[in-house]
Amino acid sequence: MNAELLISLVPQTVAWSAKTSSIMILCNVLCIVSARYIIQNKNKGTALPLSGSFSTFGLPELLATTSLGHIIGSGTILGFSYIGLLS
């Protein structure tokens, strides 16, 4: 197919701004905090130098939660831009 045709079919997304970055950060923080209560087998891999209630959080848990946070954040940003909340 023609490349121009394919490019014209892709919807225009919002530019990266403070609003979009704050949504992404919020989604990542929510996933990390919720994982504290959801993950049952913690600290199975390399430990992270964290203190407090996240001291049992390891590298696998951090990578998993931030990956999920980016997926949820991307969907949230695309959804908000589609309905017009982000411009």
From Swiss-Prot:
It is a multi-pass membrane protein. Gene3D superfamilies: Photosystem I PsaK, reaction centre. Keywords: Chloroplast, Membrane, Photosynthesis, Photosystem I, Plastid, Thylakoid, Transmembrane, Transmembrane helix. GO terms for cellular component: chloroplast thylakoid membrane; photosystem I. One of its GO terms (biological process) is photosynthesis. Disulfide bonds: none annotated. This is Photosystem I reaction center subunit PsaK. It is found in: Plastid, Chloroplast thylakoid membrane. InterPro entries: PSI_centre_PsaK_sf, PSI_PsaG/PsaK, PSI_PsaK, PSI_PsaK_bact. The chain crosses the membrane at residues 13-33, 62-80. Belongs to the PsaG/PsaK family.
